[in-house]
Amino acid sequence: MTENFILGRNNKLEHELKALADYINIPYSILQPYQSECFVRHYTKGQVIYFSPQESSNIYFLIEGNIIREHYNQNGDVYRYFNKEQVLFPISNLFHPKEVNELCTALTDCTVLGLPRELMAFLCKANDDIFLTLFALINDNEQQHMNYNMALTSKFAKDRIIKLLCHLCQTVGYDQDEFYEIKQFLTIQLMSDMAGISRETAGHIIHELKDEKLVVKDHKNWLVSKHLFNDVCV
């Protein structure tokens, strides 16, 4: 039974490493020699995946689920990153030793592949294709950060909520033709925290959008009409 368990674990790890290889557009054979340095872990909703800088030695590949990464700067400001499956994180400090104060929490049940940050940095130095892919991913990460900040500059609360909804749809939403679906984790309280407004105000705005048939709650999921994007999204 032990042998079967180890075989199953190794097969799972190999499968996820192949998924990572596809994501960064390299042959699996490049990652295969380092399989013993990697791991696959499962996290339940609300569980902390890591808190940097105490746990900043790994890079993670989100295989399944949704996460929130809360980045704290020296002034105490909080920047939130939302991610769904098929994303590599955190990579902003991959090429320099700067410590990042970042709390990563599972918004839903999650599965992640972990590998040493030093290994990924080594692979980038040894392979130009990996470096170019990671550089593009870092730029995408910074663009997401910029879009989130731009949404927060909206003067009116309703515009801020709409732009934040659009931002979430573009980063963690699932394209369903006429609308985007945001799964499970989104709440009025989270929207009010993101927008910096009261829960009551956020709830009133969401209620208006529901009346306009632009937002629909389907059990725990949110369905957001693409018509909401017209002339407001960053």
UniProtKB/Swiss-Prot annotation:
The keyword Ribonucleoprotein does not apply. Residues 155-228 form the HTH crp-type domain. A nucleoside 3',5'-cyclic phosphate binds at residues 40-129. It comes from the Bacteria. One of its GO terms (cellular component) is cytoplasm. InterPro entries: cNMP-bd_dom, cNMP-bd_dom_sf, HTH_CRP, RmlC-like_jellyroll, WH-like_DNA-bd_sf, WH_DNA-bd_sf. Residues 188-207 bind DNA. This is HTH-type transcriptional regulator ArcR.
